[in-house]
């Protein structure tokens, strides 16, 4: 199955971007048809974990209405959320019925700079009907390959990463995106902001590490297509019919108890052998 995704690298103010975002979404959907829209990290409110005005509870119903009205899945970037006096950086996933399917909690806040934010303690995936399992990273999570490995072993065939990077290490992150996609044999969708928030360079890589799209540092609203059959082909037959890292990792006895594995999915990839 092919999934058509609208990716929004927006020129954002430091904060208070809700009306701008809604106008951009409405204008885009008046001209285009997609299955899903993805925004960047903290797109609405920007950094500032103690600014309760931009907490998730103030916006979840508004974005749910947008998803329902337009019959799209929506990952509207991330928001801060307070739970039991702890603050987390959270990415909600809303389906085309306007329902909150799941929330991803940022595993690795950008410490020591992302202050007052707790570490998440659970990896997040969701099922897109007919397409398959999609994992969620939030920005700095990309820097920890263990998290990508866990998502791929859980059966994810794509990772979505809402990002807010304004710093000079952005070029390094674009390299990491390609490497992660190739190592985990999946699509990696990394959406940054620009303007007063991020410095752009959003990048999407296919399961062989090839770049599907890379933005410049200006606003860029673009559409990509990802294909579940392509991931299955690469994982079963190898990258360019060569290495099969997912199956090699699956079969290594040392790691059997180190990660939570979706055995049914991993077994469906077949034996580790040379392609016909």
Please provide the spans of the model-predicted regions.
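Short hydrophobic-aromatic micro-motifs
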Residues: 37, 132-138, 160-161, 189
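CN hydrolase (nitrilase-like) catalytic-core segments centered on the catalytic cysteine
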Residues: 56-75, 143-222
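Active-site catalytic loop in hydrolytic enzyme cores
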Residues: 82-157, 167-175, 237-239
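C-terminal beta-strand edge segments of enzyme domains
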Residues: 125, 193-276
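Extreme N-terminal starter segment of soluble prokaryotic enzymes
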Residues: 1-7
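Cys-nucleophile CN-hydrolase/nitrilase-fold catalytic domain and related Cys-dependent amidase chemistry
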Residues: 13-97, 103, 166-182, 186-187
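Eukaryotic scaffold repeat domains enriched in small/polar residues
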Residues: 18-19, 35, 69, 119-120, ...
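Short loop/turn motifs at secondary-structure junctions
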Residues: 4, 32-33, 133, 155
């Amino acid at each position: 199955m092919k999934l058509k995704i609208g990716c929004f690298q927006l020129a954002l103010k430091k904060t208070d971007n809700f009306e701008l975002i809604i106008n951009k979404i409405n204008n885009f959907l008046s001209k285009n048809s997609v299955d899903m829209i993805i925004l960047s990290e903290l797109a609405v409110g920007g950094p500032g974990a103690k600014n309760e005005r931009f907490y998730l509870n103030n916006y979840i119903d508004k974005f749910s209405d947008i998803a329902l009205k337009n019959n799209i899945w929506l990952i509207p970037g991330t928001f801060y959320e307070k739970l039991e006096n702890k603050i987390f950086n959270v990415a909600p996933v809303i389906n085309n019925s306007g329902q909150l399917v799941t929330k991803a909690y940022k595993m690795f806040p950008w410490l020591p700079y992302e202050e007052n934010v707790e570490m998440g303690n659970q990896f997040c995936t969701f099922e897109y009907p007919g397409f398959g399992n999609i994992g969620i990273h939030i920005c700095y999570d990309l820097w920890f390959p263990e998290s990508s490995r866990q998502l791929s072993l859980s059966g994810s065939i794509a990772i979505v990463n809402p990002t807010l990077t304004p710093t000079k290490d952005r070029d390094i992150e674009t390299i990491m995106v390609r490497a992660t996609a190739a190592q985990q044999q999946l699509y990696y969708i990394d959406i940054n902001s620009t303007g007063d928030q991020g410095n752009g360079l959003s990048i999407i890589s296919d399961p062989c590490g090839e770049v599907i799209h890379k933005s410049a540092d200006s606003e860029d609203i673009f559409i990509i297509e990802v294909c579940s059959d392509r991931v299955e082909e690469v994982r079963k037959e190898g990258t360019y019919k060569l290495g099969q890292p997912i199956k090699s990792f699956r079969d290594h006895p040392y790691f059997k108890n180190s990660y939570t594995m979706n055995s049914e999915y991993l077994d469906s990839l077949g034996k580790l052998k040379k392609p016909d």
